[in-house]
Amino acid sequence: MNRRQYLIALVIAAIFSACGTKANTQGRQESLDGKWEVKLSETEDNSSTENVKITLEFNLAEKRFGGEGICNTYGGDIETLNSSKGTIRLGDVISTLVACDNMAYENALFDRLPEVRRFQMKEGKCYLYGEDAETPLLILIRQ
């Protein structure tokens, strides 16, 4: 193979590689898998947690979820998930037992997670809803 053919092959490989990377990134953006920042909802006062990042991470391969609350780490099982229908059911939350300020916010998070039944991806956010709720229980922002 002469030098010109080698350079052309290299450029073509780079183009295909770049296209594949973009497709994987876009697919990940539409997936629950990965780490998110948690907000209770857009209508609720989140000011007590402005300086604290509460996270929720989904590991779809292991069917687990978990994260960092205000004071405690937590986790549980993903009992059911149907990404094409936008349905999900999370198991009971297991957490460490550290007490601190803003426990009401953290307890609200732990109470809502098992109520989640469906999700909707929209504009880089994931909205988690209860069975018949029109207002999201939780709003997740990709990290």
Question: What residue ranges belong to the model's regions?
Answer:
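Lipid interaction determinants
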Residues: 19-143
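Sec-dependent bacterial lipoprotein signal peptides
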Residues: 1-17
